[in-house]
Amino acid sequence: MQNKIDHKNIKTIGLVTRPNVSLDKEILKLQSILSIYKVELVLFKESSEILDLPKYGLDDLFKISDFVISLGGDGTLISLCRKACEYDKAVLGIHAGHLGFLTDFKVDEAENFFQAFFQGEFRIEKPYLLSVFLEDKQGKILEKLAFNDVVISKNNQASMAHIEVFRKEKKFNEYFGDGLIVATPAGSTAYNLSANGPIVYTLAQAFILTPVCSHSLTQRPIVLPKGFEIEIMAKDCILCIDGQENYKMNDFKSIKVGLSDKNVALIHPKNRDYFQILKEKLHWGN
């Protein structure tokens, strides 16, 4: 993954917007700003039906772009981060709506950001993703990445989930309840937080197991280190990656999850303050 970005030689920047929302006005403003620096803005083909700008499929967009802008909310950025890992490209999150935990500023603030960016005034953070290995009954292994979390929940919401967790073939824990969240530090402020899981600093090399509505008062979230791989077994349950990809657990004989060696480069303003964002979003202090 990129350790730095050569801000002096940026030629092409890709842009992907939140789906099913017209952001043509915001796109044109970004194009106008980037043209000052002789940088071409290219679009994901589904980001605009009207604008006369170069458009590409997602894979081609990543191939030709020096980095990619996510214009939308945290959900838009999360899906892009998994793709960014494939192409070793960085992602910049600009929010179109409410401030997110991952998207730093609005389009109205983009001019100031890029003025600083092209002078080398920015920072790169590289949060780790989860690796998910799904082995089917024929022994074929499907490897997936999760930026935020992997959630195991009951297929039939009227019944209780029974989830067993193993490490090195020894039972590590057993959960009865509505489900189980396996979250990254970046995802600790998402569903994990709603389930009373801990907030873990984004760049920590760890992941979190958080039970959802456990039927036992003694079950509590636990933070596990990088290198600690778990195997999850549960019948009649659904495994969901980042709220976007669903798999029936009955279709697989083995599902293993752990913190990946892969991370994604996120571009931030130099003065970004993670704890100030927490304070604003969670209404800490005055």
Swiss-Prot record:
Which residues does the entry assign to the active site, renumbered to this chain? 74
Give this protein's Gene Ontology molecular function annotations.
ATP binding; metal ion binding; NAD binding; NAD+ kinase activity
- Chief subcellular location: cytoplasm
S-S pairs: none
Q: Name the SUPFAM superfamilies on file.
A: NAD kinase/diacylglycerol kinase-like
Cofactor(s) required, per the database record: a divalent metal cation
Q: Which reaction does it catalyse?
A: NAD(+) + ATP = ADP + NADP(+) + H(+)
Q: Which GO terms describe its cellular component?
A: cytoplasm
Q: Which Pfam families match?
A: NAD_kinase, NAD_kinase_C
Compartment(s): Cytoplasm
Question: GO annotations under biological process?
Answer: NAD metabolic process; NADP biosynthetic process
The entry's NAD(+)-binding residues are 74-75, 148-149, 178, 186, 189-194, 244
Please indicate if the UniProt record lists Coiled coil as a keyword. no
Q: Write down the EC number.
A: 2.7.1.23
Alphabetically sorted, this entry's keywords are:
ATP-binding, Cytoplasm, Kinase, NAD, NADP, Nucleotide-binding, Transferase
Q: Which InterPro entries match?
A: ATP-NAD_kinase_N, ATP-NAD_kinase_PpnK-typ_C, NAD/diacylglycerol_kinase_sf, NADK
The role this protein plays is:
Involved in the regulation of the intracellular balance of NAD and NADP, and is a key enzyme in the biosynthesis of NADP. Catalyzes specifically the phosphorylation on 2'-hydroxyl of the adenosine moiety of NAD to yield NADP.
The family assignment reads: Belongs to the NAD kinase family.
- Protein name per UniProt: NAD kinase
**Which organism is this entry from?**
Campylobacter jejuni subsp. jejuni serotype O:23/36 (strain 81-176)
Q: Which gene encodes it?
A: nadK
